[in-house]
């Protein structure tokens, strides 16, 4: 259990929030359930489709309640589906809008500010503004390393812009009292941009509680998507970071193996590209692209799949990260097929939960997919059981939530920031 004490007033800053599917949603719910008063400063939901969710948008601030937490939404520009300019405007619009409006919208001083920092890193700027005005300490939970992620995804390559982003990153790290990282390998990249006194701590992601082994009813809707044979399922964002070119290459090499089905559940900027490639190469008998489903239904998709697929592009930054998808796969006790390297591949190997090919080797991914398709059911079950055991040992949700709660309380008890 975390250190007991009075309930805290916690401001959570993140550009994305429910109904967008990110780990910050569960963090808000858990902290609220533990008796704290949580306020979320976020934008209008438009991820991953690139258009605002029905009922949102416009240029007015919106307030709502979610699981007992107060949610403040500031106006932003939607990210669009394929325009780098719109994506850049989306990134900038939240940082500017929230930084200007937050001092007026967050009327009382929070005990502590938690930034759930995904891409872009600029989403942390409103927290720094509030720290300077109200004196609250900031805990920055780094999910993506910038500017490395910016270069790796190819969104911006201009060295002047990258240099400007690096300056902003230094500013954010300097003004964060605790920097938490979701992967231990992040530390060596953060240290040169942080100050010597920066307090950097390991805080991994954990799976939401609904990610668990489940029994699927005979009449469950999810069953209609699975055909007889060997089903490989990819879940989540279909974006540039996912290395879909490698996956497509593997599918093409196994085109004649009609017993192997590739199922994609999710949406994102590269969905249209993938659908076009499937049509172009005559892969409709091998591939299904289903679109997005509620996160709570994903364990049932996972249970029906023979293997779950995890892929990332061949970039240094992606070898350092642990995609939160991996924890959800492990928590459901399913074997994993990876086109990954670095930390994620190391976890998969240590857990004995599946096989991993290099991220840029479609022929190796195809070979491993074929190998797993020929494994006895008993062997696949062993891999799934090992995945679940590793998840419970290394990514226990209550343990790491206790750590987060303790650190937030620690900052709340320190002298006012200046």
Model-flagged regions — what are they?
Residues 1-65, 256, 417-418:
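N-terminal subdomain of nucleotide-sugar transferases
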Residues 44, 185, 203-206:
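Carbohydrate-associated surface elements
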Residues 307-310, 328-339:
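Short hydrophobic beta-strand element within catalytic cores of glycosyltransferases
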Residues 219, 377-408:
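A charged, aromatic-enriched C-terminal amphipathic alpha-helix characteristic of glycosyltransferases
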Residues 122, 129-133, 159-179:
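Membrane-proximal helix-turn-helix segments that form the acceptor-binding/catalytic region
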Residues 229, 265, 272-299:
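Nucleotide-activated donor-binding/catalytic signature segment of Leloir-type glycosyltransferases, i.e.
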Residues 207, 224-242, 248-251, 263:
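Conserved donor-binding/catalytic core segment of Leloir-type glycosyltransferases
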């Amino acid at each position: 259990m975390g250190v007991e004490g009075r309930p805290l007033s916690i401001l959570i800053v993140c550009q994305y929030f429910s109904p967008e599917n990110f780990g910050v949603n569960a963090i808000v719910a858990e902290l609220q359930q533990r008796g704290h008063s949580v306020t979320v400063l976020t934008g209008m939901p438009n991820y991953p489709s690139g258009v605002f969710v029905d009922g949102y948008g416009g240029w007015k601030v919106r307030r709502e309640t979610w699981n007992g937490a107060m949610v403040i939404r500031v106006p932003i520009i939607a990210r669009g589906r394929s325009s780098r300019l719109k994506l850049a405007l989306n990134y900038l619009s939240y940082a500017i809008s929230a930084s200007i409006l937050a001092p007026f919208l967050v009327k009382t001083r929070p005990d502590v500010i938690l930034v759930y920092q995904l891409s872009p890193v600029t989403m942390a700027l409103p927290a720094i503004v509030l720290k300077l005005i109200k004196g609250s300490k900031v805990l920055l939970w780094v999910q993506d390393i910038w500017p490395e992620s910016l270069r790796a995804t190819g969104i911006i390559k201009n060295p002047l812009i990258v240099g400007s982003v690096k300056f902003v990153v230094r500013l954010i790290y300097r003004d964060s009292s605790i920097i938490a990282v979701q992967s231990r390998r992040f530390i060596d990249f953060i240290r040169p941009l942080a100050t010597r006194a920066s307090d950097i701590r390991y805080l991994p992601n954990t799976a939401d509680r609904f990610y668990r082994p489940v029994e699927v009813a005979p009449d469950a809707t999810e069953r209609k998507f699975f055909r007889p044979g060997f089903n490989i399922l990819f879940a989540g964002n279909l974006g540039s970071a996912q290395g879909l070119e490698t996956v497509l290459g593997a599918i093409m090499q196994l085109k004649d193996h009609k017993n192997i089905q590739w199922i994609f559940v999710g949406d994102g900027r590269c969905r249209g590209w993938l659908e076009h490639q499937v049509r172009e190469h005559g892969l409709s008998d091998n591939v299904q692209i289903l679109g997005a489903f509620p996160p709570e239904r994903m364990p049932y998709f996972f249970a029906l799949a023979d293997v779950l697929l995890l892929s990332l592009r061949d970039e240094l930054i992606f070898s350092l990260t642990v995609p939160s998808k991996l924890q959800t796969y492990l928590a459901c006790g399913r074997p994993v097929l990876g086109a990954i390297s670095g930390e994620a591949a190391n976890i998969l190997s240590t857990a004995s939960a599946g096989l991993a090919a290099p991220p840029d080797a479609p022929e190796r991914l195809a070979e491993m997919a074929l190998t797993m398709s020929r494994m006895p059911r008993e062997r696949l079950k062993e891999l799934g059981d090992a995945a679940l055991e590793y998840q419970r040992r290394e990514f226990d949700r209550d343990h790491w939530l206790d750590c987060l709660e303790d650190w937030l309380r620690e900052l709340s008890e320190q002298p006012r920031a200046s």
